[in-house]
């Protein structure tokens, strides 16, 4: 029996037939060749960058829209077009989930300009900043920085510093022309800025509305055509996947469902994706927003969530900290910072109980089920 099982596993690993023509088509970072339904937003982005191509200053923009509405893809597409047109504009896309510090942001800008990262030690931030701005001034190049998920810079309390450093550079370095595309889903974003930043960051608002059902179906069908060989999945099954995608409100869920269905069908040595593969995929896939957020957490933050989920009930901060300290050895101040971050990311809620010192004892409440968390990669 064990020998048969080993042969089954070996067959799966060595099987050289595939349903996938291009598995990358189902990756979260994939930029499709056929990018539809965002022509007006692309035009608005182009209008913001156009002055930089004419030796002027780019127009700042706030790019608003819920998750998976095409914001990131639109920016990457327009940046590719600009860079293929002119060397006079540096277009730098930065994922603020991954880079949350002032040094991290400007290291990405430095890398974009010079082709390599600056030294991580021994070089002060001021020198890196000066090198960037002197290059822009001497080469007469404009800089446009897209700060994707800029809310993470607000959590790390670096948003105002970063925006100030970019947008007021011309006051110190004559001739420098800079602009920022701030990408987020919070329409109240600009009101969180310091006055000295708010006075210079007067952005155009570019809104990415949710896709309609017809648009979602067509986008998923485009991915199917690129990612699978012909005949792998029927339009009827794609309609069902579209319905589930609309229920979640997140296009990434549908794209991920296609990938999981394809993998399950391959494991069964099936030439097509069937109803049974979709049913199994639905049971194995967690909420897409939770999955994408959890991917950005470090190991201590994930351990915090594991402990809270394993408890099976709401916990006081004190009780959770005792378990967290035993597991990680972290200090209470680190524990508190994790609470603040996870609450900011809407993974947990907190509620004062009125007990404890000065009545500040807190109950920690997860905003997800244990089962959903367990279905996230890394748990």
Swiss-Prot record:
SMART domains, per database record: Cdc6_C
Top-level taxon of origin: Archaea
MF (Gene Ontology): ATP binding; ATP hydrolysis activity; DNA binding
Binding site for ATP: 69-73, 211, 223
Key words, A-Z: ATP-binding, DNA replication, DNA-binding, Nucleotide-binding
One biological process term in Gene Ontology: DNA replication
Any Pfam family the entry gives: AAA_22
Gene3D superfamilies in alphabetical order: 1.10.8.60, P-loop containing nucleotide triphosphate hydrolases (3.40.50.300)
Protein modification: Autophosphorylated on a serine. Phosphorylation is inhibited by binding to MCM. Both single-stranded DNA and double-stranded DNA inhibit the phosphorylation reaction.
Membrane-spanning residues: none
Annotated effect of mutating residue 71 to E: No labeling with ATP
Similarity comment text for this entry: Belongs to the CDC6/cdc18 family.
Function statement: Involved in regulation of DNA replication. Dissociates the MCM complex and inhibits the MCM helicase activity, suggesting that it may function as a helicase loader. Binds to both specific and random double-stranded or single-stranded DNA.
Comment on protein domains: The N-terminal AAA+ ATPase domain and the C-terminal winged-helix (WH) domain are both required for DNA binding.
Assembly and interaction partners: Interacts with MCM.
Name of the protein this chain belongs to: ORC1-type DNA replication protein 2
Lineage, broadest ranks: Archaea, Methanobacteriati, Methanobacteriota, Methanomada group, Methanobacteria
The encoding gene: cdc6-2
């Amino acid at each position: 029996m064990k020998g048969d099982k080993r042969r089954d596993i070996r067959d799966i690993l060595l099987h050289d037939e595939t349903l996938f023509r291009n598995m990358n088509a189902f990756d979260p970072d994939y930029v499709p060749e056929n990018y539809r339904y965002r022509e007006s937003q692309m035009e608005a982005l182009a209008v913001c960058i156009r002055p930089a191509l004419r030796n002027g200053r780019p127009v700042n923009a706030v790019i608003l829209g819920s998750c998976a509405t095409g914001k990131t893809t639109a920016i990457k597409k327009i940046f590719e077009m600009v860079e293929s047109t002119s060397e006079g504009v540096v277009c730098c896309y930065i994922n603020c989930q991954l880079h949350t510090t002032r040094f991290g942001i400007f290291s990405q800008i430095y890398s974009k300009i010079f082709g390599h990262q600056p030294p991580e030690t021994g070089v002060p931030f001021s020198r890196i900043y000066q090198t960037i701005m002197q290059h822009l001034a001497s080469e007469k190049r404009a800089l446009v920085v897209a700060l994707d998920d800029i809310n993470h810079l607000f959590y790390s309390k670096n948003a105002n510093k970063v925006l100030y450093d970019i947008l007021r550079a011309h006051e110190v370095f004559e001739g420098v022309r800079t602009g920022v595309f701030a990408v987020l889903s919070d329409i109240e974003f600009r009101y969180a800025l310091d006055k000295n930043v708010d006075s210079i960051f007067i952005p155009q608002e570019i809104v990415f509305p949710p896709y309609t059902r017809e648009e979602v179906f067509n986008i998923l069908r485009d991915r199917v055509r690129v990612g699978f060989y012909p005949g792998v999945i029927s339009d009827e099954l794609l309609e069902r996947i579209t319905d589930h995608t609309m229920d979640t409100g997140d296009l990434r869920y549908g794209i991920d469902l296609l990938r999981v269905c394809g993998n399950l069908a391959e494991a069964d040595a099936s030439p097509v994706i069937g109803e049974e593969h979709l049913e199994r995929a639905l049971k194995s896939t967690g909420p897409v927003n939770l999955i994408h957020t959890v991917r950005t957490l470090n190991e201590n933050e994930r351990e915090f969530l594991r402990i809270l989920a394993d408890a099976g009930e709401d916990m006081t901060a004190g009780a959770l900290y005792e378990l967290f300290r035993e597991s990680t050895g972290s200090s209470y101040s680190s524990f508190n910072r994790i609470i603040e971050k996870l609450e900011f990311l809407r993974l947990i809620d907190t509620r004062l109980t009125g007990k404890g010192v000065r009545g500040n004892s807190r109950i920690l409440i997860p905003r997800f089920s244990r089962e959903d968390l367990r279905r996230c990669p890394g748990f």
